[in-house]
Amino acid sequence: MKIEIMLKKLKVITNVFCVIALLTGKSFGQINQSKINKSDFTDPYAVFSNPPEAAKPGVLWMWMGTNLSKEGITKDLEALKNAGFKRTTMFSLSDITTPWAADIKNSPTPNIISWTEPWWKLVRHAAEEAKRLNMDFGMFNGPSYESSGGTWITPELSMQEICWSQNLVSGNKHISLQLKRPQVNPRANQSFPHYNPNTGLFEKPEIEARKTYYKDIVVLAMPAKGIVPENKVINLSKKMTPDGLLEWDAPEGEWTIYRFGHTTMGALIQPAQWEATGFECDKMSATAVEFHLNHVITETQKYLGDLIGTGFSHIHFDSYEAGVPTWTPKMREEFKNRRGYDATPHLATFAGRIINSKADSTKFKNDFDATIKDLYRDVYFKTIAKKLKEANLDFLCEPYGGPWRQDEIMPLVKNVMTEFWTTNGTYAPYELDPTVAALRKSGQNIIEAEAFTGFPDDSKWSETPAWVKPIGDAAFCAGVNRMILHRFVQQPWNDKILPGATMGQWGTHFDRTQTWWKNGMPALVKYWQRCQALLQWGNIVPTFADDFASENIEGKPLIKSIHRKSQDVDIYFVANTCHNKAIVKCIFQVAGMQPELWDPVNGNARSVNSFKEKDGKTIFDLEFDDAQSYFVVFRNKYVKPINPIAQNFSTKKEVLKINSTWKVSFDSAWGGPVKPVIFNVLEDWTKNNNLGIKYYSGTATYHTSFDFKTNKKSDDTSSLYIELGEVKEIAAIKLNGKDLGVLWTAPWSVEIPAGLLKEKKNQLTIEVSNLWANRLIGDEQELDDCEWLKGQMGDFSPGHKAGSYLKQFPDWFVKKQPRPSKGRYCFTTWKYFTKESPLISSGLIGPVKITQR
């Protein structure tokens, strides 16, 4: 969750795309409906049709402050299991993450403080449930998600910074001078402001230890002006008493006396509950790192010991935002051992002085930085890897953003994770490409990503599976093959409290309280499982200019691809990563093989029968709907068919438009009409005059009846499809009592099994789920029965609309009384909308048709 640099680079990273060479050509084909004999499929199809455990995605599970419950934990894990997830990594955060460490007053469960016994009991319950459900459960290495520390870290074990005071004196006499102790800004030297409950301000809080904790390093005297030869730097440390009194016979000339020391940076872990907030440990001190890890492991073993390796499996370290320290107690000896010379005379470069020459001072700074990188590797990361291995815990990490060499760290980590965001609805990688490149080089096959981290502009209970699909597809094409979703929030309350808890303003709302979770999430996860199964199979083929090329024939797609290979099998994932239809000529660096087209949305597979070969390449057209993707698989030698079929994609023929009336049932618990409503014509709910429909959020059930008379001949091998037209946002279809599945992305159609249609009274039922946004906006038309405070994003993200957070849990909520505002239905901890916010199109808009292909 790299907030700081990510925010600085938004305009750059939104323009980072996979490079695909473009070649010219013209072609257009039609669908061939001949089926592949699935018994002929070898290993790739086995994992595609039945994805293994390794292909299942995971989530970052956010426990927000005191808002936790056993019942909610069980429901969360069961929902994840049923949807097809495998791993969950828990973070224990503040009630609200922006402002950092903000709390919501009047909590129903105020005693649940991170890393205290009531909290650990809930962690144990989660581990027991994970074991029961055969899920992989672990957690971050302390409170917060940044970076490694807690209340147990004292000032001397915290991250350190060098500081100094200076005095100008004239020589040729005895100097008796009280040297001032170096002073630093008492406010924390950290990346982001905190909400400080002691002052009520959003600030970098004053740290008492930055006023009181100090250790001397050295006292140096040198000529007051100009470049200073190293032999003119005089160490006066032995001439200063412990209380800072200097007694020195100064040579002739003007001298500057520097008193160098170090103090705590005051860097605090973020964003944790205020009661659980403490210092970041010194990452360059073996004493501090071991102390932190011993505390983490000892507490984990105390409460979860018998579950380690079964219900509890890993400790996570997130992307680094703790700042760069400039000192550690053993820095001088570490520097000399690693760089071969004494750093002491050169410390004045921190005060802006030049020692020997500009080149020498530059070299010293580079050597000093290199020593910091060495210590992060040898002290911090190697100690983590060693300690966790000894404790039988896996080491998970996002190894970027900090003062180290990334390629040296990744081999120490069991599961390396990279990161991508959603920015203005597009794929926005952060440190993804270099991480993937380094992982490929090291031979690691599984490339995980913190996936879909989002700003409130995009992520405000308005996300859909169809919206996230092309963003995830772009990440797949960049090399990611295991999604770890950001984020899934622990929902502690009963199922009437919806949409419930949030991570403040951050992240895509992959929560079990989503309107579309029941029908949409299993379908989306199955898609990811199929993709990840094939994207983990074999090895990535290094990218080169003509490995895959495409030329747009119709439309304006953004085509991305990735190529994997194992022995004689080539697998290409080809994705249209924008919401445009297109026909694209595709050129693959394969010859003599039969191309096959596998659809990860529905699991269907078929041969490509119309293609040509030229110069060792296979060439054919692909027809893409909005954000559609395919796997193109070459695994069998090409054998020329006896009766060749010249077309790959066929035009569809409309055989019936369903114009009958629809009976639509809404859930009155969320403001919908109590009785079913007749729709003579399908329409957007937001255009309806009935406010219960206009502002409705949730699932509504459409039902209609229609007659159908087929003109198909007995030898006609074409198939019939139900086409839904425009759907906002998820549709689960039943025809004559048979479940035809869930539609969540284009093309919005499903094949009708042979023999299912009748001539008379076909019964069609469609469950349609929209988004929470409209009900939340509808609630804003009513009197508010909660108090809100403005969300703070700070100066580091200008232009983003944050929203407001709940000031306190209202008494009616805590006491489980009827809410005062009868026209309100939703309850959540973050407000994204006002009464003027635009509604989002909803419902089955159609037209609904039967087509033949």
Could you say what each language-model-derived stretch is?
Residues R210-K211, K215-Y303, K612-E654, E759-K761:
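Extended acidic/polar, glycine-enriched regions
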Residues L93-K239, W248, I269-Q270, A276-T277, ...:
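Acidic/aromatic-lined carbohydrate-recognition and catalytic surfaces
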Residues M1-S34:
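Bacterial Sec-dependent N-terminal signal peptides
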Residues D40-R87:
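Mature N-terminal segment immediately following signal peptide/propeptide cleavage
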Residues Y145-S148, W152, L168-S170, Q183-D216, ...:
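An acidic-aromatic loop/edge-strand motif
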Residues S610-K612, L740-W744:
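Short beta-strand segments within Ig-like beta-sandwich modules, predominantly Fibronectin type-III
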Residues I587, F706-F708, K712-N736, L743, ...:
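Aromatic-lined ligand-binding clefts that engage carbohydrates, nucleic acids, or primary amines
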